[in-house]
Amino acid sequence: MRHLSLLLLTSFFFWNCEAQPNRQLTPEQEKMSEATMDFETYNPPSSLVVPENPVKRAKFPFIDVHNHQFRMPEMDLSTLVAEMDELNMQVLVNLSGRGRGDEAHLRNAIKNVNGNYPNRFIVFTNISSDGIDEPGYSEKLAQQIEADVKMGANGLKIYKSLGLRWTDSKGNRIAIDDPRLDAAWAKCGELGIPVLIHAADPKQFWEPFDEDNERWLELKTRPGRKRSETNPAPFDQIIQEQHNIFKRHRNTTFINAHMGWMANDLAKLSKHLDENPNVYVEIGAIIAELGRQPRMANKFFEQYQDRVLFGKDAYNPEEYYTYFRVLETADEYFPYYKKYHAFWRMYGLNLPDEILKKLYYKNALKVIPNIDPSGFPD
């Protein structure tokens, strides 16, 4: 019986081989097998059929705590306000109050706001490393911040230039935790204004430019963003310098821009927030990281709902739609708006209303002074 079964199996095998001869490829198929396509070009539309709920207006009025309006001193704010109204943006925080460092720029920006839309804008000030080697630099820094706040500034924005590009008179890199800058952080704590600080860039900018780099396309498109251990310093070192000032100045409130480049490791970010109760984070330019891990991100927002602010960074009204869709809907598998930032698809977090309210405006009202609360529901 065993031999009979083996004979039948062998006969079936040979019959199947004869019945299914090797098919020759057609010329068209042969050509297809030799085709190549670069990564930038390959971008097929999804064939997945699922509910789509694009959102062009936030569910609740929101405060964008990370925005740059370099033309604020002379611009017609009515055009900007009309765009804000379409998005349901109640307040825009212009982090570039001094523009490229000019006190007159800050004064005229505040004058334009106060004379036209005093309840729709908040302006932050900025500092410079000019004269950092000269006696009295720290005192002058503190005096400038105090004067700017009296003028109408409600926070201090630190660009990534500190840690990446600022140098002293000898050409040495100025570290974020340089003691000569301590007066600035201390003065902000004394005045009750937050410091929104951007340190470094995504860690992938320091990694080899090869097939294993998730930011390969961005670096190819923007090669000037490539960094190294000596250009200007290791990523981890720069980030640690930032964390050092958080710990050194517990009476100062800091907003760690772009989630401190830890949105791709929310367990690490959670530990960071646990260790630094004076630190908040904002979601500018990292929504794609949250959108590809909806369950993990949902748990994070549940646990740290009082520590996260809404921020966008680059101002383009249509790009806000993606933020709203990630935060408010349960949509599946939809694209980010810049492939070179994120080539993957995202999923909606479908955050509950109470968390959305905290993210959109309640936390910012708590952290940033002098925002008019009357434009928000509760």
Language model segments and positions:
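Bacterial N-terminal signal peptides
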Residues: 5-13
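Active-site gating loops and adjacent loop-to-helix segments of metal-dependent hydrolytic enzymes
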Residues: 26-41, 59, 203-229, 280, ...
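Active-site gating/metal-coordination segments in enzymes
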Residues: 29-31, 50, 105-225
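Acidic (Asp/Glu)-rich catalytic clusters
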Residues: 52-57, 80-88, 107-121, 143-153, ...
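Hydrophobic faces of well-ordered beta-strands that scaffold small-molecule active sites
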Residues: 63-67, 91-95, 121-126, 156-158, ...
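Acidic-and-aromatic substrate-binding clefts and catalytic sites of carbohydrate-active enzymes
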Residues: 69-77, 96-106, 130-139, 166, ...
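H/E-rich (His + Asp/Glu) clusters that bind or coordinate divalent metals
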Residues: 73-74, 81, 230, 235-244, ...
